[in-house]
Amino acid sequence: MPKAGGSEWATLWIIDALENNKFPYFSWFDRNNLLFAAPAPLPAGSDIPPGWYSVYHAFDEECDRVYGPSPVVGQTVYGRFGRLLRGTRRAVVRNDLRYSDTFGGSYVVWQLVRTPFKNCTYCYGAAYGPEKLQRFIQCLLSPPMQTTATRRSDTREQSYEEAGAAAPAPPKAPSGLRGRPRKSNRYYNVGDITTEQKAACSVWIPVNEGASTSGMGSSGTRQVTQASSFTWRVPGDPPAPSTLTGPSDPHSSGAGLPGTAPPKPQHETRLAGTVSGVSGVAQTPGDTGQLAPPMRDGSRLPSTSPWIPACFPWGDLPVTGWWPQGASGLPEKVHPPTTGQFDPLSPRWTYTGIPSSQLNPAAPSWIPPHAQAGTFVGEFSQGAPLAPQGLLPQSGQCASAWLPRRETGAEGACGASTEGRAPQGAASERVYPFEPQPPSAPAPGYAKPSCYNWSPLAEPPATRPIRAPVWHPPVGHAVVPEVRTPLWIPWSSGGAPNQGLSHTQGGASATPSAGAPPTPEVAERQEPSSSGIPYVCQGDNMATGYRRVTTSSGALEVEIIDLTGDSDTPSTTVASTPLPVSGPRVFQPTVLYSAPEPAVNPEVSHLPTELERRECVCPGSGERPRVPLVSTYAGDRYAVGGYGPEQSLVPPPLGLPLTLSNLQGEDICTWEEGLGNILSELQEEPSSSTRQATDRRRPRSRSPHGRRTPVSHSGPEKPPSKMFFDPPDSQRVSFVVEIFVYGNLRGTLRREGDAGEAMLCSWPVGDTLGHLCQSFVPELLRIPRLTVPSPEQMEILNRVFEGLGHGFPIFCSMSGIYSRNATQVEGWWFGNPNSRYERILRSFSPRVPQQLFNTARYLATTAAIPQTPLSVNPVTCGTVFFGASPASTENFQNVPLTVKIFIGSIWDSLH
């Protein structure tokens, strides 16, 4: 029995029968469109003309020859023909073209489908197949791959994540078990880092919110242990409705809304961690009624007290501002239902149902809740948690009930803590979940608060600060009412900023005060600080200027009021710009933060290093702090203003890109970058008490400040900062090719660059009907074989053609000509898109795609020389030399094959 083969023979057999008219009633219907007519079965009892089914009988015999004999019992005469063509997609029936002749015979019209042929060198080359050429366009248009070494553990973790994306969520781990530290695809998982490190400092870092990773369920929420910290979704994205409704177990249902069971962040859920909003939170009231969250000792608040989540992001605020007040103290234009609800038509959560007795109508609407409670909290991002006003910890109450904190070994204001030992009830992770705590009496005297505790005391601790933001009221989504009270930021042009700043261990932050800025008399009465905070230094503490930041109708205004003038009226400088618009949401939250910069000594002429910036050395006499003010908006950075040794109080124009020119060399990073740097320090740096011992045990080369430089083996996946050429446009254009053999022009080819279209192959002779060369991705320049009289030269030329294989791949777009040396023959090309390499012959790289011609440079050159006629080509298009390096760009008689490629429009203008 012959071996079963493919179905290519069927197309060839049909085309041969049609071209030679081998069977009656079997002919072309439209040859150009590959349409042919075959006789249809006649009804029973009708007269069958002679030879009506001859084509089907011959086809059955050919099938028996190729595939072997087959039984014909129960098979119609035309059944095998139709099954083979339909099953192999060699042809399709065109029922819309069925017709009958004058003798009553009915005909079925088929249309051949163009397919590749095995005997085509271009379709199935020995060394180059269609798959390789199809990958070429992806390699050409994609940026270079990262060469960063990947650790084996990272590769294993990635395989786990890929396997877990399609797997169901594993069973919940017991609370006593501790998960293995892992890193997300984009940023460090802070909770995992704090699990292993002694100094547990919780900082919020965005994580990869794409497909579900290992250990995630269908909602995308990873089941984590108590060691893992919470994460926050992108502000402004609406939480998707959850499928969890009516839970019977309060710990298995994520609660967090009035009338639902409380969350259990110890080992089950991660609040507000993914696009689904508050992860694991039931979107409908549960059957358990209003349950208060558990205390750390296991007790609960009275069930009559509604549980208001203290961890909703800014983008979920009902309206603009912190708490715009109505007559009853509730937010304006918000009808207070009994439970929180999600409005599918509005991209925000509406948290209502707050009793008016728990609100403070007398408080200014724009002041942050934590500012009303006492001071400021260290690190936040745009998705920072906010505590409702009614449930704010008051003076002396433990702040860790609302925000995570880290212990520094000192006696905290909210409980005792010793070095190396976590407080009771927090195990050893030192990451405190969001749980309300009963009020406790304030500690007698002054006690240094922990990094994230609130402190009603005015004196800040003398410890190394961490970058802290200066808050600004967020801008809402759709409605942007005018902020009633501006935010005054003390600003100094001489000694230091004013003491109106409230300090914490996490850094210095502005505690806004309503109304007009303080007068110089008020500023004089404020005592100078002896802290190591870089914002305040010894000496003159007189504020010489104030910066007022307001938002009105979607515009950001920065007003500088200079108090140093001689006149009674202070000078005012106002800079205003509309806030940018991003996506379907009209506005997103805007955060103004002050990135701490080290002191700058005028006598030292060097820019501070990154470690120096992190060290935040307190400026002394003769030194001035540099605190640039930056607005982080929708992932972009805008310079709002700042001063340095050479700058005045007038801020630069808003909307300028953050470059070294407008910030005078100051390295300002985004929230993610800044927090990532802090994380790198925390990961590499042990606790303060054991750092010296660690340094003695590991004598290595240190930085000037005694801190190891963090080294990351596998960083986040980011696009390359600089491309070696401009990426091509998606629009394909026609191109013209001139072919030279040993320096003599032998022919000109013109090809139309239709995107995504393949061309009919003309090999071996003439047009092969029904053949589609699928290797034509991208444009494949098939150079015809040419001959020369010299046998020696002809032998070299044949080797070049064999090395070229089926063609030379090029990609022509509006931006230029791109190619890659996907051939076996050695090649050179002339010039480079970079003017630095102009008129230099460069060898092809077998792996890197290259730009042979830059349209922008050509147009710039022609515009610079308007008198030069277009017939003179000032910039040579893509010229490729195959087989030998030319003696010069003008003399290439020694090159066996030369190809000059022009973009069609440029060729038309030149000739």
Swiss-Prot record:
First-listed, main subcellular location of the protein, grouped into a coarse class: host cell
A single cellular component GO annotation: host cell nucleus
DNA-binding annotation, residue ranges on this chain: 7-114
Comp. bias intervals (Basic residues): 697-710
Compositional bias ranges of the Polar residues kind: 222-231, 495-505
Coiled-coil annotated residue ranges, if any: none
UniProt record, GO biological process: symbiont-mediated suppression of host cytoplasmic pattern recognition receptor signaling pathway via inhibition of IRF7 activity
GO molecular function, one term: transcription cis-regulatory region binding
Region Disordered, annotated ranges: 147-184, 211-302, 494-537, 681-727
Compartments where found: Host nucleus
Superkingdom classification of source: Viruses
Keywords, comma-separated and alphabetical: DNA-binding, Host nucleus, Host-virus interaction, Inhibition of host innate immune response by virus, Inhibition of host IRF7 by virus, Inhibition of host RLR pathway by virus, Transcription, Transcription regulation, Viral immunoevasion
Low complexity: bias regions: 211-221
Its job: Plays a role in host cell apoptosis modulation by promoting TP53/p53 ubiquitination and subsequent degradation and thus down-regulating TP53/p53-mediated apoptosis. Works as a potential viral transcription factor to modulate host gene expression to build favorable environments for the viral lytic life cycle and greatly accelerates the induction of an immediate early gene RTA, early genes ORF36 and ORF57, late genes ORF25 and ORF64, and latent genes LANA1 and v-IRF3. Inhibits host interferon-alpha production by interacting with host IRF7 and preventing IRF7 dimerization.
Family: Belongs to the IRF family.
Subunit and interaction comment: Interacts with host MDM2; this interaction facilitates the proteasomal degradation of TP53/p53. Interacts with host IRF7; this interaction prevents IRF7 dimerization and subsequent activation.
Protein name stated in the entry: Viral IRF4-like protein
Species of provenance: Human herpesvirus 8 type P (isolate GK18) (HHV-8)
